[in-house]
Amino acid sequence: MTRINVGIPPAELFLCIVLVEHREIKRIPNCVAKGKYNMDGMPERFKLGTGHVKFFYNKLLYLKKRYVRLYEECIERGFNVQNYIEAWNDIPAELMNDYNVRANDIRIIRERINERLSK
């Protein structure tokens, strides 16, 4: 599983969530850089579950920007985390696209966070 808390500012997330996302977000560009990705069946809209990682294969600029915010938030909170920004090196230019977050994306993520925290 790879957690991407789309549209939620890292400053609003609990520390454990920020640290996990910081660690996991780099999986997607690493996968793409190694050529271990397939665009078949890529969802048109953000979702959780099957296909949620594929959704980001052509939105790697969005993930890079999000990663920078996550990294900065970790540092701001006093954590000594490794900077994985180099994971976005060697990404094909056609996959380095941004993404405009939709209100429904945020709703989906907030519901998932609340569900996880209530357990």
List each model region and its residues.
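Extended, charge-rich alpha-helical interface modules
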Residues: M1-K119
